[in-house]
Design a protein with these regions (language model features):
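Cytosolic regulatory regions of ion transport systems
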Residues: 1-216
Length: 216
């Protein structure tokens, strides 16, 4: 998942609005939907594409073009029935990834059974953090060092094999700093920039979280 994917956020309460705003602020294409016109009005200034619709209705899902969306985030934890219906309709529409906010572990089991690809607890993962994770997913491991800086593991690409870090100029091209190399269970913090990279190893890098998009 990345900035090149299309997103829909269904439910514009505080959590859903935070997810949508963070995605929009980072250049992602986002469709935001809520059944309450007041919530839509409150979000329209920061989220350009906002629609008022009942996403538990099949016709609304079709009209909104949800079948063309890559990732749907359903943010209606207080309404289990609506969340279940929304998950079902989104999966029936062919959405590859459906993420849904839930209120407790029982709801988590139910939502997983009806097809949710990922179920999140808002008290454990903020809306802003979810958006950042969506934008930077695809890495083997990601650790937020601060609000702006993250450390991630990235697989050595096929086109990098046999080349050195000097030749690749990763810092210049992608604004990342290679701090270690993982080879299986072994991690070496002594990074030789003149050593040719091997297939199957991972680079551990530190960079501005948003600039990590360049590596995707």
């Amino acid at each position: 998942m990345s900035i090149n994917k299309t997103y829909a956020v269904l439910g514009l309460g505080r959590y859903g609005k935070a997810v949508a705003e963070e995605l929009v602020n980072n250049g992602a294409e986002v469709l935001a939907v809520d059944i309450d016109q007041n919530n839509v009005n409150n979000a329209i200034e920061t989220i350009p594409v906002c629609k008022c619709a009942d996403i538990t209705e099949p016709e609304a899902i079709k009209r909104l073009g949800i079948s063309n969306i890559d990732i749907v985030i359903i943010a209606m934890a207080s309404n289990l029935e609506a969340s279940v219906m929304a998950v079902t309709l989104c999966k029936e529409a062919g959405v590859p990834t459906v993420i849904v906010k839930c209120g407790n572990e029982m709801h988590q089991k139910i939502l997983s059974r009806v097809g949710a690809d990922r179920v999140i607890f808002p008290e454990k993962e903020s809306g802003t953090r979810l958006a950042k994770n969506l934008l930077t997913s695809g890495f083997s491991e990601m650790i937020e060092l601060s609000d702006e800086v993250s450390m991630v593991e990235i697989d050595v690409r096929d086109e990098w094999v046999g080349k050195t870090l000097i030749e690749l100029s990763l810092r210049k091209k992608y604004s990342v700093n290679v701090v270690a190399i993982r080879n299986g269970d072994k991690i070496s913090t002594t990074v030789d920039p003149a050593l040719p990279l091997e297939k199957g190893i991972q680079l551990i890098v530190i960079a501005n979280t948003l600039k990590l998009q360049k590596l995707k």
